[in-house]
């Protein structure tokens, strides 16, 4: 609600209000520098902000950050993983942080590593991984504690078409089970096909948000986005 974030004199995000409901895939669209990453980092508690309030299922990120962080997972646009660890060790490390029991974590690691076809790679150091493999590992780590809200910054960058298709299915599964997804993207075709709702941000201000039908009407999302960007 009414989020404002400044860097010195520069306002990166101004009076932004969004409501993400359970069961929704919510896309966040804007050009580079529009304020997408700043908004996401504020929601997950990485950045402090000047004005407004952020609540995750009733808990304030400022007043009760631990309770909030247990309910969410965040994948940044360039995940900073512990390169000296093997993929498997890293996933167990994340599972330890969130208190995931041994049986559940093994089940989830097996399920998602098999889906992404990186099971054999988990024994190798993360330093040897390609960008796409690191992205897959970050996705599995985000899913490992079954969070209520998953927040992702450009999650499809670096993924091959098959992995992108798998991730879309995983996102829909989260929402079908009562969770929610909020992700930024500049791939408008993905947003149009995948999202229940979208928000468009320009120069730190929310300029349009709602269901896909409300935002784009009879036009395609790309036309609406380019028109709004040009105003």
What are these regions (language model features)?
Residues 92, 96, 103-121:
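Conserved ABC ATPase "signature" region
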Residues 150-154:
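Catalytic Walker B motif of ABC-type/P-loop ATPase nucleotide-binding domains
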Residues 52-63, 67-68:
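Conserved ABC transporter NBD signature motif
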Residues 209-210:
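ABC ATPase "signature
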Residues 164-177:
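Helical segment within the ABC ATPase nucleotide-binding domain
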């Amino acid at each position: 609600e009414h989020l404002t974030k400044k860097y010195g004199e520069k306002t990166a995000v101004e009076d932004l209000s969004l409501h993400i409901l359970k069961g929704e895939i919510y896309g966040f669209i804007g050009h580079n520098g529009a304020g997408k990453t700043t908004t996401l980092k504020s929601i997950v508690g990485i950045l402090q902000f000047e004005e407004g309030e952020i609540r995750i299922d009733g808990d304030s990120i400022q007043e009760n950050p631990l309770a909030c962080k247990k309910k969410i997972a965040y994948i940044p646009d360039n995940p900073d993983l512990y390169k000296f660890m093997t993929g498997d060790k890293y996933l167990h490390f994340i599972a330890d942080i969130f208190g995931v029991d041994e049986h559940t974590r093994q089940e989830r690691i097996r399920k998602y590593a098999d889906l992404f076809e990186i099971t054999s790679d988990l024994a190798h150091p993360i330093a040897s991984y390609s960008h796409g493999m690191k992205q897959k590992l970050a996705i599995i780590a985000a899913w490992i504690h079954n969070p209520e809200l998953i927040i992702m910054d450009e999650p499809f960058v670096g993924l091959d078409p098959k992995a992108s298709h798998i991730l879309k299915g995983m996102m829909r599964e989260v929402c079908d089970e009562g969770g929610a997804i909020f992700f930024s993207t500049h791939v408008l075709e993905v947003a149009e096909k995948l999202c229940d709702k979208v928000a468009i941000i320009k120069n730190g201000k929310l300029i349009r948000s709602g269901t896909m039908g409300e935002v784009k009407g009879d036009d395609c999302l790309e036309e609406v986005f380019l028109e709004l960007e040009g105003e």
